[in-house]
């Protein structure tokens, strides 16, 4: 009897211990999941609200998403303010209007606790725009960005204290010196272009660019680069590497001793933007259509066709390469690239600073 009582007491004690130790942890774990879901949903809502604010010119809505009591919060807000103004300026120059900005967000990591969190995410943003004199024709392009967000909860709302991402518009905050009216008039006088007779090699180049333009590609491709090649974004940039891939994998240009990629690495003409531009021109594989400021070359840009490329020059140095992948409803050339990933984006969008010069280059397939 005594032995039976001891066993009963032991069992009751074990049950109490299980309730005491296991149940609280379950509740805490559940609370952590709820909190992470809350911060994730709040981050996604911020992106949606910011895009709506850009469309509506609602600067107050953008301002409400930042903690302006911190210098990093102020800087992040001011950057978004400049971005909104630039896009409005570009619309005016182009005779166009953005009608929808749609983000697709993939959360990579969430760290933190209580009221402070850090979020790593990627965002593939679709920009839809029309030309004001032809609103029935909707144009679409995609831009992909990687973000690190620091967020805190204040007065029941999650707001941004710090944000880092490679902004595709950071080199484009000045359109003031452009003769907007004459540029707009010329753009609106153009018509849609027909590329149905494009060669198979050019068509294949465009297909490769569409498939492997990373975060700017379609969701079905997983927002990834071609894993057959190294990603050089963290080592100076991947734009020329991508352009070389497009020409080799898609356009069937053969590698050689000067232009090459293998397991040991890549030549400068394959990997470096300046080296790529120079190699393509001086090897005879490409020829220059035009070179100069936007006002000097924008009319010539209508001679670009899919499979050609644009090189962007700052202070005498080629800093970026984009591949031409199409044209919009007004025949305006569209480009795709790596670094800040772009998919069929107007060739000057994000490159409107007065100090930038453009190389429009025809590739000889």
Residue ranges and their predicted role:
Residues 5-30:
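Sec-dependent N-terminal signal peptides of Gram-positive bacterial secreted proteins and lipoproteins
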Residues 31-93, 247-249:
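Core segments of small alpha/beta cavity-forming domains
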Residues 82-133:
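Surface-exposed, charged secondary-structure patches
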Residues 103-110, 146-152, 322:
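Hydrophobic/aromatic beta-strand elements that line small-molecule binding cavities or substrate pockets
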Residues 136-190, 194, 333-338:
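Short beta-strand edge/turn micro-motifs at domain boundaries
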Residues 187-270:
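N-terminal capping segments
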Residues 264-334:
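...with weaker cross-activation on analogous glycine-rich loops/strands in unrelated enzymes
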Residues 334-340, 348-365:
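Low-complexity, Gly/Ser/Thr/Pro-rich intrinsically disordered linker/tail segments
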């Amino acid at each position: 009897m005594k032995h039976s009582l001891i066993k009963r007491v032991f069992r009751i004690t074990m049950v109490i211990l299980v309730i005491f130790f296991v149940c609280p942890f379950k509740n805490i774990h559940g609370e952590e999941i709820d909190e992470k879901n809350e911060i994730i949903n709040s981050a996604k809502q911020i992106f949606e609200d910011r895009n709506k604010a850009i469309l509506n010119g609602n600067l107050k809505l953008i301002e409400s998403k930042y903690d302006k009591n911190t210098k990093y919060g102020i800087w992040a807000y001011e950057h978004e303010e400049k971005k909104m103004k630039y896009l409005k300026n570009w619309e005016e120059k182009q005779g166009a209007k953005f009608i929808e900005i749609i983000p697709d967000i993939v959360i990579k990591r969430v760290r933190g606790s209580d009221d402070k969190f850090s979020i790593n995410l990627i965002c593939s943003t679709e920009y839809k725009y029309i030309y004001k004199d032809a609103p029935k024709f909707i144009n679409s392009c995609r831009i992909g960005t990687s973000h690190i967000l620091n967020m805190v909860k204040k007065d029941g709302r999650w707001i941004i204290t710090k944000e880092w991402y490679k902004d595709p518009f950071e080199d484009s905050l000045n359109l003031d010196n452009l003769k907007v009216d004459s540029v707009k008039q010329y753009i609106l006088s153009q018509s849609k272009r027909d590329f149905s007779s494009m060669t198979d090699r050019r068509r294949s180049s465009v297909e490769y660019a569409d498939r492997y333009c990373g975060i700017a590609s379609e969701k079905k491709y997983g927002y990834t680069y071609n894993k057959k090649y190294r990603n050089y974004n963290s080592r100076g940039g991947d734009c020329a590497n991508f352009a070389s891939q497009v020409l080799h994998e898609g356009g069937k240009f053969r590698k050689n001793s000067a232009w090459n990629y293998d397991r040991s690495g890549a030549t400068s003409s394959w990997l470096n933007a300046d080296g790529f531009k120079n190699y393509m021109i001086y090897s005879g594989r490409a020829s220059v259509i035009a070179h100069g400021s936007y006002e000097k070359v924008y009319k010539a840009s209508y001679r670009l066709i899919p499979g050609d490329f644009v090189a962007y020059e700052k202070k005498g140095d080629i800093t970026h390469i984009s591949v031409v992948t199409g044209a919009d409803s007004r025949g305006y050339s569209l480009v795709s690239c790596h670094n800040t990933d772009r998919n069929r984006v107007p060739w000057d969008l994000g490159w409107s600073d007065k100090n930038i010069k453009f190389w429009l280059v025809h590739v000889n397939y």
